[in-house]
Regions:
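Short, glycine-/aromatic-enriched active-site segment of Class I SAM-dependent methyltransferases
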Residues: 190-212, 216-218, 223
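A conserved beta-strand element that flanks and buttresses the S-adenosyl-L-methionine
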Residues: 160
């Protein structure tokens, strides 16, 4: 089955869900085409909100094999993110408060984050389903090419999961498997991106691999269901502002978690009106963009995009604004066409 409807909240388990934003049926954001007319499948791209914990999630989940078995995103190719991974390795080791011996990185991609941990003397283990990346990630680390499920077994001091946790259609099962593989005094570090998406009226990071958008309350309730405790939350500017959730099996939640939830409450994150306004603001933003594009087209200008990113495809397919071309410096994308909107991708040499 390629499509599954998410009928209950993936965080707290309740079935009280309210539609927030409908981005129409769209193809997978990274499914670039060799020709304009190449057949492609489209799937619903809508987000719902849980009325109990305000967790935001996709209305439907696409079969992960269609997305991850051949994954084009490679984490170690941008200097900004490589520098961040250096900081992250130091941060994780310092928060452990002792001398960690081993780390498991779930969704380890090309192994770049594991490289940083190995340089600090840790035994390194990884899990990732991308067959095309396994040769890279397994060069210096013990990496299982597949999904992190109940069959995986490797006891470690630290478990990290950067951004991939929100890709998981069964997060409770995921955390239970973490608990099974974690040493008694171990820690879990889960990073989720776009923590301010709703408050900032952002929708371009909504695509089929991003199933969940966690707030602090929804993550706390999910941890509690798994018999774990959320013990701290740190905000970091990477990926449009991310949360790093620090989770323990043997430490109780400190008072500051309630204070952090109170801050989200004060910002309006648990207010129904916030989500009504968010939906309308996103629609209004697109309409204003379309008006500007139409104005410049009428003046004889071409409409050219820069960067054939997944988030650009969400925007293109929702707005239906016709672009003449998109410039991208990645030679692997040049000569291809964007999914859905079928815009040709070219190199920056066309500017000459």
């Amino acid at each position: 089955m390629d499509l599954t409807e998410n009928k209950v909240c993936l965080a707290c388990g309740y079935d009280e869900l309210t539609p927030v934003l409908d981005l129409n049926d769209q193809p997978l954001a990274n499914s670039y085409k060799k020709s304009k007319d190449e057949p492609e499948a489209s799937y619903p791209l809508n987000i719902n909100r849980c009325n109990v914990c305000c967790h935001v999630q996709l209305s439907h989940t696409v079969n992960p094999d269609l997305i991850y078995k051949n994954y084009l995103y490679v984490s170690g190719t941008t200097k900004t993110y490589v520098d961040y991974m250096d900081w992250y390795a130091d941060f994780v080791c310092e928060r452990f408060n002792m001398f960690p011996q081993s780390v498991l990185d779930i969704g380890c991609n090309d192994g770049s984050q594991l490289d940083k941990f190995k340089a600090r003397g840790l035994e390194t283990y990884g899990v990732d389903p991308a067959i095309n990346l396994w040769e890279l990630s397994s060069k210096n680390h013990q990496v299982h090419c597949g999904y992190f499920d109940k069959h995986f077994s490797q006891s470690v001091d630290i478990i990290t999961c950067q951004n991939a946790f929100a890709h998981n259609p069964r997060p409770l099962e995921f955390l239970l498997n973490c608990k099974k593989n974690l040493e008694i005094d171990g820690l879990i570090f889960i990073q989720t991106s776009q923590s301010d998406m709703i408050l900032n009226n952002e929708f371009d990071t909504i695509y089929h691999e991003h199933i969940s958008f966690y707030n602090i309350k929804s993550m706390m309730l999910l941890c509690n269901r798994a018999g774990l405790n959320l013990i701290d939350v740190v905000k970091t500017p990477i990926h449009g502002t991310s949360y790093i959730f620090i989770i323990s099996a043997d430490k109780s939640a400190p008072a500051n978690i309630k204070n952090l939830i109170d801050m989200e409450t004060a910002a309006g994150l648990y207010d129904t009106k916030t989500y009504i306004d968010y939906s309308q603001n996103c629609i209004d933003m697109v309409e204003k963009f379309k008006e500007k594009v139409e104005y410049w087209r009428n003046q004889g200008y071409k409409v050219v995009g820069y960067g054939a990113a997944a988030k650009a495809n969400t925007f293109l397919n929702f707005s239906k604004v016709p672009f003449d071309m998109i410039i991208d410096d990645n030679p692997m994308k040049q000569g291809l066409f964007t999914p859905g909107s079928s815009v040709g991708i070219v190199g920056s040499d066309v500017l000459n």
